[in-house]
Amino acid sequence: MAPPARLTPVPTEIIDAFRAVAPTLEDFARQHDLLIERYRRGKPAWELRFARRAGGEAVVTISYREQTGHVLDVSITWWVDDREDRTRRLRSEKVGVYDRRTAPSELRRRLAAGLAAIDRWTPADLGPAHGPFKAWTEHPAGASLPLR
């Protein structure tokens, strides 16, 4: 059996970029009862995750844009898994960009706009089912996420 793959350490410039916006992201997540996942699977991003009352899971993703360094992309995704058919339906869109040289209130506005957009989405807004995927884990991840 092969040893598990190791994730590459997150570069210092990415950590520094998120350190500058961490208070805003952490405060927003706390206010809206969102789970923060930092650098999930080694990605240069923070994710604000939650389970939706409408079903499935959703995430507001704040990604480091490597070409510029001072710009963070804000995007949103909602997905619903059909565990029996091993398929997933989702919707995703970019909310906008945040220039770290501007006020933190600009980032908060983009986060709020993304969360509001997710809250407006209905199952009819989801795309077609994709899959089938390999066997799911026994317990869906959404079971441990805050419900919104």
Give the residues covered by each predicted segment:
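Intrinsically disordered, low-complexity regulatory regions enriched in serine/threonine/proline
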Residues: 2-24, 36-148
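Surface-exposed charge patches
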Residues: 27
